[in-house]
Amino acid sequence: DAKGDFSEVSRVLNQTDLLYFSGDDTNILPHLSIGAAGLIGVTANVAAAPYRTIVDAINDNDLATATAAHQALEPLVRAIMTHVPGTVAAKYVLHGLGRIGSPRVRLPLVGPEETEAALIEDDLALVHEIQGLDLTRFRPDRNAAAGGALPKTAGTTRSNG
């Protein structure tokens, strides 16, 4: 679930036997701490290890370790989930890290505008010491990310003018 409605998460966990998986990257720790079974996170595609740490720590009743991992992830989550749709930012970052061949997304999504890309990059500059993530290798390619998945044809993607 990725609605961002904590009271709804609580209701589902209290009133059903459903296994609840958090899909709200910002609230994964709170959801796990009240009984969510796991997570499906966009940001985990960029840095999976801290999420494993959070899940294991919650399962071991070690809130301090889970909280430390959550806090370390905050600027990365902000970079991925705030300025453009998460899939757009995740592909932009993964391509900049050399992990995928193209940052292009399927229409109707389009790559980040210059200002959005700059905001993503500014937030990434605040990320420090996340296990499995080396941002010193980050080389963003704003031109490759522009537009949608189709060639730049009038009416289908952003035009140059």
Name each model-derived stretch:
Residues R99-R137, N160:
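Flexible C-terminal active-site loop/helix
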Residues L135-G161:
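Basic/polar N-terminal segments that are highly enriched at the extreme N-terminus
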Residues L63, T67, V84-A89, I130-R139:
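Flexible, glycine/charged-enriched surface loops at secondary-structure junctions
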Residues L32, E74-L107:
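Conserved short secondary-structure transition element at the edge of the structured enzyme core
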Residues D1-E74, R78-T82:
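Catalytic alpha/beta core domains of metabolic enzymes, predominantly
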Residues I40, I58-D60, L94, G101, ...:
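Short alpha-helix boundary/capping motifs
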Residues P50, A69-A72, G86, E116-D123:
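Alpha-helical structural motif
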